[in-house]
């Protein structure tokens, strides 16, 4: 029985590899089963077969992943580098488990585009080694897996695949918030940035650092999504004219999209009156007041008035300026008010105007050579002298002089009253200081080189008892002349007797034989009458001489 070889095996690309038997059997002969070849002889053909198929498959160069943008064009690259003869190249798209031919290039029959791709697919060139195509007007259905296939002879088919991802570029818009931004109002949406129907969803950021953002996203069945971002802030007039920027990022964009928005903050008028320099005097000309107003929306008009309701002649209001047509007089002194209003309210400002007297100026007469004559001398003698000052200035000087005199008199009187009060207080305090108790002072004897002073010495029985403080100091006195019976007596009832005050005097040498110590001047030294005594506030009577000791 003869054996026939089976079909040749196919390469993964469809090429067939021919295998032949090493010992073909002779016709009509029955031979024993051949001996299995060594393992190495079996591996060599298999290695050559897999090498040929792998070399053919790896020779088609494509991009594994391609990103396409909806509505735009995309190129699908396919380069074929083989040494075999290329008989045909084609592109196919995989739909589930089946494939759909997109385009075919045959060297003899030319180009062919199938189905919905007609008019949208073009080959880049006519070379069989470059199967790159351009797909126009990308739609959602164009996403998926595409195969670039090449048919060669004698090895058969070779192919590589690329995956196309369709992105949708978002539609970006920036609009003003629904509500007006009012100075001092609550948190308000200033601007809204929208990135609509993007695939995938876009990313929105804000620049400005004046508020905060709040975003929300909505998804759709076609895998697109819309993101809405609101920029909120607390409006203030100082933010007027500031710029905030919406920044949109998306993989389908070549660069970020940036939209800016200028904040429009509305506020009531801010009013100020200018033009008065504080030196408006009688007779001055060409002065005016200006009403400056800053408001958004712009103010309707400016209204001038005076606080006292008067409106002197010569005042002309033109737009925001008040003109003083005539030379200034004291009648123009007053408080001028400017009121400005817009749709958000009314504001005003006022300025106090004071018209002072004209400045005093002395004009020097030009020096002209003068020749005297008898008639001129007579005219000079009879001419009345004129003061170079106006009468109003003289009246002012007179008033100032009278005021100065009155102020001086009042000040002098107040000064005298103050001095009198101080003197009385001083005398009263001095009188209150002396209590009427007189204590003899310790007598300090002179040195050997000095003669003893002749002081009056009081008698011992004429002095009151010591106070406690003095007794402590003189507990054991030396040569103390105070009599013992005096110290033992608690009281001297005769001390306040006027008759006992008249004593005889002893000479100073009466005590010369005694040692010097604590001595008292006796009233024997004095011969005084009632006129020589002084009555004290506590009822005691003291000698005038003792008063001055």
UniProtKB/Swiss-Prot annotation:
UniProt membrane topology term: Single-pass membrane protein; Single-pass type I membrane protein
Disulfide bonds: 78-148, 193-246, 291-338
Tissue expression: Ubiquitous with high expression in testes. Localized in spermatids at Sertoli-spermatid junctions. Expressed in ovarian granulosa cells, but only faintly expressed after ovulation.
Gene3D superfamilies named in the record: Immunoglobulins (2.60.40.10)
MF annotations from Gene Ontology: cell adhesion mediator activity; protein homodimerization activity
Family matches, as SMART domains: IG (SM00409)
SUPFAM superfamilies linked to this entry: Immunoglobulin
Protein localization: Cell membrane; Postsynaptic cell membrane; Cell junction, Adherens junction
Residues listed as glycosylation sites in the UniProt record: 73, 83, 125, 186, 222, 331
Keywords for the protein's UniProt record, in alphabetical order: Cell adhesion, Cell junction, Cell membrane, Disulfide bond, Glycoprotein, Immunoglobulin domain, Membrane, Postsynaptic cell membrane, Repeat, Signal, Synapse, Transmembrane, Transmembrane helix
Chain ranges on the Extracellular side, renumbered to this chain: 58-404
Signal peptide residues on this chain, from the entry's feature table: 1-57
Gene Ontology biological-process annotations: cell adhesion; cell-cell adhesion; cochlea morphogenesis; establishment of protein localization to plasma membrane; fertilization; heterophilic cell-cell adhesion via plasma membrane cell adhesion molecules; homophilic cell adhesion via plasma membrane adhesion molecules; lens morphogenesis in camera-type eye
InterPro entries per UniProt: CD80_C2-set, Ig-like_dom, Ig-like_dom_sf, Ig-like_fold, Ig_sub, Ig_V-set, IgC1_2_Nectin-3-4-like, Nectin-3_IgV_dom
Annotated Pfam families: C2-set_2, V-set
GO CC annotation: adherens junction; apical junction complex; axon; cell-cell contact zone; cell-cell junction; dendrite; hippocampal mossy fiber to CA3 synapse; plasma membrane
Domain of life: Eukaryota
Record topological domains on the Cytoplasmic side: 426-549
Family assignment from sequence similarity: Belongs to the nectin family.
Assembly mode: Cis- and trans-homodimer. Can form trans-heterodimers with NECTIN1, NECTIN2, PVR, IGSF4B/Necl-1 and with IGSF4. Interaction between NECTIN1 and NECTIN3 on the pre- and postsynaptic sites, respectively, initiates the formation of puncta adherentia junctions between axons and dendrites. Interacts (via Cytoplasmic domain) with AFDN, providing a connection with the actin cytoskeleton. Binds with low affinity to TIGIT.
Protein name (Swiss-Prot/TrEMBL): Nectin-3
The species this protein was found in: Mus musculus
């Amino acid at each position: 029985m003869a054996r026939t070889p089976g079909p040749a095996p196919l390469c993964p690309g469809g090429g067939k590899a021919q295998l032949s038997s090493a010992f073909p059997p002779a016709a009509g002969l029955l031979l024993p089963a051949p001996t299995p070849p060594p393992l190495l002889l079996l591996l060599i053909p298999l290695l050559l077969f897999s090498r040929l198929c792998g070399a053919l498959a790896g020779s088609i160069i494509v991009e594994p992943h391609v990103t396409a943008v909806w509505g735009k064009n995309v190129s699908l690259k396919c380069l074929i580098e083989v040494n075999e003869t290329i008989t045909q190249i084609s592109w196919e798209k995989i739909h589930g488990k089946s494939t759909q031919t997109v385009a075919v290039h045959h060297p003899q029959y030319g180009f062919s585009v199938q189905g919905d791709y007609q008019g949208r697919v073009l080959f880049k060139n006519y070379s069989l080694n470059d199967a790159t195509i351009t797909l126009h007007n990308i739609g959602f259905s164009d996403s998926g897996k595409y195969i670039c296939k090449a048919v060669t002879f004698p090895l058969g088919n070779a192919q590589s695949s690329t995956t196309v991802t369709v992105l949708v570029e978002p539609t970006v818009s920036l609009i003003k918030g629904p509500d007006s931004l009012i100075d001092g109002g609550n948190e308000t949406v200033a601007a809204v940035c929208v990135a609509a129907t993007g695939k995938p969803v876009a990313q929105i950021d804000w620049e400005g650092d004046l508020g905060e953002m709040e975003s929300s996203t909505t998804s759709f069945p076609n895998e697109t999504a819309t993101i809405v971002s609101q920029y909120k802030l607390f409006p203030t007039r100082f933010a007027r004219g500031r710029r905030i920027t919406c920044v949109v990022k998306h993989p389908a964009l070549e660069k970020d999209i940036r939209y800016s928005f200028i904040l429009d903050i509305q506020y009531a008028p801010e009013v100020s009156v200018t033009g008065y320099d504080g030196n408006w005097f009688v007779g001055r000309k060409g002065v005016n007041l200006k009403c400056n107003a800053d408001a958004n929306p712009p103010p309707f008009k400016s209204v001038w008035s005076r606080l006292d309701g008067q409106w002197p002649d010569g005042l002309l209001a033109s737009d925001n300026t008040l003109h003083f047509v005539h030379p200034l007089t004291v009648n123009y002194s007053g408080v001028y008010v400017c009121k400005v209003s817009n749709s958000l309210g009314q504001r005003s400002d006022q300025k106090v105007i004071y018209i002072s007297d004209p400045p005093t100026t002395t004009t020097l007469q030009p020096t002209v050579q003068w020749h005297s004559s008898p008639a001129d001398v007579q005219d000079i003698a009879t001419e009345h002298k004129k003061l170079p000052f106006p009468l109003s200035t003289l009246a002012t000087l007179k008033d100032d002089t009278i005021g100065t005199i009155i102020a001086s008199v009042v000040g002098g009187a107040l000064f005298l009253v103050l001095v009198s009060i101080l003197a009385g207080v001083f005398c009263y305090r001095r009188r209150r200081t002396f209590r009427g108790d007189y204590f003899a002072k310790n007598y300090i004897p002179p040195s050997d080189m000095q003669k003893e002073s002749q002081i009056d010495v009081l008698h011992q029985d004429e002095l009151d008892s010591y106070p406690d403080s003095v007794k402590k100091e003189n507990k054991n006195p030396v040569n103390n002349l105070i009599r013992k019976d005096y110290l033992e007596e608690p009281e001297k009832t005769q001390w306040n007797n006027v008759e006992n005050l008249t004593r005889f005097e002893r000479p100073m040498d009466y005590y010369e034989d005694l040692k010097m110590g604590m001595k008292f001047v006796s009233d024997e030294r004095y011969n005084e009458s009632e006129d020589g005594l002084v009555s004290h506030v506590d009822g005691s009577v003291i000698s005038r001489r003792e008063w001055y000791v």
